């Protein structure tokens, strides 16, 4: 995914995960967008 900013964290933008982040990456939070989510560790 593309890098993105979420609550001051640098995260990864996932286009295919609309409401949750993929498991197995150790993400601790996210920001939802109209399409996709920004997931950060």
Curated annotation (Swiss-Prot):
Keyword Nucleotide-binding included in the entry's annotation: no
Protein name: U-actitoxin-Bcs2a
Record-linked InterPro entries: BDS_K_chnl_tox, Myo_ane_neurotoxin_sf
Gene3D superfamilies listed in its UniProt record: Anthopleurin-A
UniProt GO cellular component terms: extracellular region; nematocyst
Pfam short name (any one): Defensin_4
Family indicated by similarity: Belongs to the sea anemone type 3 (BDS) potassium channel toxin family.
Keyword Disulfide bond tagged: yes
Recorded GO MF terms: ion channel inhibitor activity; signaling receptor inhibitor activity; toxin activity
Chain's role: Neurotoxin. Causes paralysis in crabs.
Domain of life according to the entry: Eukaryota
Disulfide feature: 4-38, 6-31, 21-39
Keyword terms, alphabetized: Disulfide bond, Ion channel impairing toxin, Nematocyst, Neurotoxin, Secreted, Toxin
Subcellular location: Secreted; Nematocyst
Principal subcellular localization: secreted
TM helices/strands, residue ranges: none
Organism: Bunodosoma caissarum (Sea anemone)
């Amino acid at each position: 995914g593309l890098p993105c900013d979420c609550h001051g964290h640098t995260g990864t933008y996932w286009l295919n995960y609309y409401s949750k982040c993929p498991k197995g990456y150790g993400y601790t939070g996210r920001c939802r967008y109209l399409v996709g989510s920004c997931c950060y560790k």
